[in-house]
Each structure stands twice: as C-alpha cells, then as structure tokens.
Amino acid sequence: SQIIIAYEPVWAISTTIGHKDATPKDSEEMIIFIRKVLADKFGAKAQLPRIIYGGSVNEKDALEFIRDGGAEGLLVGRASLNAKKFIQIIKKCETLNN
C-alpha cells in the first residue's frame, strides 16, 4: 500500500523523436497489463500499489487519464512548469473527490 508505480510510455514523452500522445485507452490497457504482471509475481497483494500515469498530461486531458484511463494519480511533467496550467489540472482532478 506504500508503493506507487509510475507508468510513462517512452513514445509519449514530449522530447522524444516521433512523440505520440497517449490516450486514456492506452493507459488503461497498460495499467491492466501491469496489474496482471504484478499478480503473477505477488498474488493478491499486487492490487495494493497505486499506479499513476505520466505521459505528457495537460490541463485538457489529465482528468480523462484518471477517470477513463485507470490511473490513480498523475506524474505531471511539462505542464507543471506553467503554474496556471498545473493549477487547472489540480482543480479538475479535485472534482473526482466531490
């Protein structure tokens, strides 16, 4: 319960040549895969770690990665360098707790 796994597809990193934005569906599929691998190795305890997503999220799509993509949090990169955008991400994600 104290372990957090960050998933960031290399092809979704904005500085990567051939960069391609990931979708919440991409995230969901990989999070399911990660959970299956963990379950094979560790059994029922595999459901305990939180899995967060970190592939070029922004204020427009961050909420979708949590709501539809299976992520339990975000590892915000470039968007965190702009305070207004970062605050927008936080406020949108807070709506899930209401």
Which residue stretches match the model-derived regions?
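A generic secondary-structure signal
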Residues: 37-41, 64, 92
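Hydrophobic faces of well-ordered beta-strands that scaffold small-molecule active sites
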Residues: 3-9, 47-55, 72-76
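Acidic (Asp/Glu)-rich catalytic clusters
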Residues: 66-68
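C-terminal helical cap(s) of enzyme catalytic domains, especially alpha/beta-barrels
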Residues: 24-27, 80-98
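Generic structural signal for well-ordered alpha-helices
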Residues: 28-35, 62, 87-90
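Active-site rim beta-loop-alpha module in soluble metabolic enzymes
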Residues: 1-46
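Glycine-rich phosphate-binding active-site loops on the catalytic face of alpha/beta enzymes
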Residues: 16-17, 56, 70-89
